A protein has these predicted regions:
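Short catalytic micro-motifs in class I SAM-dependent methyltransferases
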Residues: 120-124
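Conserved class I S-adenosyl-L-methionine
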Residues: 1-43, 57-61, 148-184
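A short glycine-rich, Lys/Arg-flanked "PGG" loop and its adjoining helix->strand segment in the class I
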Residues: 131-143
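Short alpha-helix
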Residues: 215-231
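Core SAM-dependent methyltransferase catalytic element
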Residues: 231-252
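A conserved beta-strand element that flanks and buttresses the S-adenosyl-L-methionine
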Residues: 117
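Class I SAM-dependent methyltransferase SAM/SAH-binding core
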Residues: 49, 56-104
């Protein structure tokens, strides 16, 4: 038996390394997101919604920073949710829900949250649905609460330079894959599919996403800020940037 079968923390570690191939400064991004929470809670224990939370990456870091936080993690992927559940145990409420429909909110254990965080996830949603989701998220935040979305968000004021940065990052990533020093996205999922415990859940995932996720859609920061403003948030802006990735925040 490999350690990945018995130990959810080994899966967490492998997921982190796989994701860092795409975003080497990923931890700095999480720090900026948690700093944003800290700015709105006035020292209180925060109630935080980890949206499209996957393996629980954000929840784990939130609890490390705010040990008394009330965490809710929402996702649809059964394999990633299994890793999250095993890692978080009773420190978070795990919710299975589809963000592609407005009904996802009915599964939440709380009516309002201090913060909603999401990272590298919402680019799977089409433009019209993402705009609707932004409006729904405003309604699950308390007045003064904050939403932070970190994702691939090119800087539309530097289109050519951004393209070159992305091309160079892809070349470096592919070189690491070729050298065997990092797992690619597909390699990680192949490993999960071969695991006796996770394999059946990966198979179930394929029934949920029979052709994989929908095509990725990565609009610039300006699109997100306009959509968040249209959703009714009182303040919107960028709280972090690293190359072609950024984190935008919106205050109810």
């Amino acid at each position: 038996m490999t350690p990945y079968i018995e130990d959810p923390w080994a899966w967490q570690e492998s997921w982190d390394r796989q994701q860092e191939a795409y975003l080497p400064d990923r931890e700095q991004r999480f720090t900026a997101m948690l700093d944003t929470i800290d700015a709105v809670i006035d020292g209180r224990a925060p109630r935080v919604l980890d949206l499209a939370g996957g393996t629980g990456t954000i929840s784990l870091r939130t609890l490390a920073r705010f040990p008394t936080a009330q965490m809710t993690l929402v996702d649809l992927d059964p394999a990633l949710l299994a890793i999250a559940s095993a890692s978080l145990a009773d420190r978070a409420t795990i919710v299975t829900a589809d963000l592609g429909t407005p009904e996802w909110r009915s599964a939440l254990p709380h009516r309002e949250y201090d913060a909603v965080l999401t990272a590298t996830a919402l680019h799977w949603l089409p433009a019209d649905r993402l705009g609707q989701l932004y409006a729904e998220l405003r309604e699950v935040l308390r007045p003064g609460g904050v939403f932070v979305n970190a994702d691939h968000m090119p800087d539309d004021t530097l289109p050519e330079l951004t393209k070159r940065l992305m091309d160079r990052a892809r070349d470096r990533r592919n070189a690491r894959y070729a050298a065997g020093s990092m797992l690619s996205w597909s390699d990680w999922w192949n490993r999960a599919g071969a695991d006796p415990a996770l394999g059946p859940l990966v198979a179930r995932r394929h029934t949920i996403y029979p052709t994989g996720h929908s095509p990725e859609w990565n609009p610039p920061v300006s699109w997100h800020l306009a959509a968040l403003t249209a959703a009714g948030f009182s303040e919107v802006g960028t709280v972090w940037r690293g190359g072609p990735d950024a984190a935008v925040a919106a205050v109810r």
